Every structure is written in C-alpha cells, then in structure tokens.
Amino acid sequence: MDLLQSIRRLMKREAAPRARPEKSLPQVELQTVQTPTAPKTFLFPAPNLYSRILVEGRTVGFVDYGLNPLGDRIYIHKIEVAPEYQRHGYGLAALALIAAQYPVPMTPVHIYGSALDFWSVAREHLQRLGRQITDQLRASQLEEEAKRWQHLVPEPEHERLIREYWVWVESERAAGRPAGPGIK
C-alpha cells in the first residue's frame, strides 16, 4: 500500500478491522430509576431511565437513557464509568443488559470524540448478540426524530380549549351567525 492510500484511509477513518479476542463480560447489575420527562423535551411523554452500574455492590458508573414512546428504539444519552473502573468492560456489560431488556435498536445521542472507540467496540459486541446500534443522533437531529411520536403527545388543556373555540367560531360564521372576538 502506498503512502497516498494510507493517508486516504486515515482521512476516511477506515481503520482496518481489528481482531479482538472474545472474552466474557464482567458481571454487573443495573439499579434503575424511572423519572417523568418534561413536556417539550426529546422523549416526552415517555419516561427517562437512569441506571447505576453496580459491581459487587459498588457504583462504578451510570447510564442515562430512554425508550421512545413508540417503543421501537432506545436512546443512550450518556454512559459514564468512573476513571478507575474504565477499560474493564463494565460499560459494555451495562449496554448488553439494556439490550437484553429492550430488544430494539439502540441509538447513541451525540457521541463525543473520547467515546468513539467505546461505541465501535460496543457496536461489534452487540451485533454478535444479534442487537443493533444505529448511527448516532446529533443534538441538531433530536427535534426531527421526535416528530415520529408527536401524535402520542397529549395536547395541553389550554391549547385544546383554544383550538375548540376557533372551530366553534368558524362553524358559527359558516352558519351566518356572528361569533368570535369583537362581537357585541
């Protein structure tokens, strides 16, 4: 391979596939808390999930994630393992547990540079388990993605009342009766 091909390969970030020895994941436990999401946030009306990653009763990290309201995808907002516990497979083991609990594609939300290697390994491992990690979702793409379940978002009562009022005004006007603002 000549120098130009090597440079192109690096520019495209097409690293040669590395052979990784198959090793079992460490035993971890997830302690999960479910919290409601606020209206007009990404996963609303589905709850947000926050899991502590435990190893022999010690907290080694956490995962912040959520299942979308359609139930067809898990979004991983953040996975963090304390520095002294990194590179032991705890984060990967936590993702494997989440993937087993929710057999739907998993989507990382905005992968930071330092996590690219982790997600590459996670993608390979979960694919071997028959699970899929989709391309990351950037912050600028969240609103567009959330449109897929907007039909499930309950309409606030004040907005419903305003909408119904204007429907009534239009029906009254169509019937030739005065209605709406400014009627005396």
Per-range role (PLM):
Residues D72-P83:
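Conserved acetyl-CoA binding element of GNAT-fold acetyltransferases
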Residues V81, R87-A100:
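Conserved acetyl-CoA-binding loop-helix of GNAT-fold acetyltransferases
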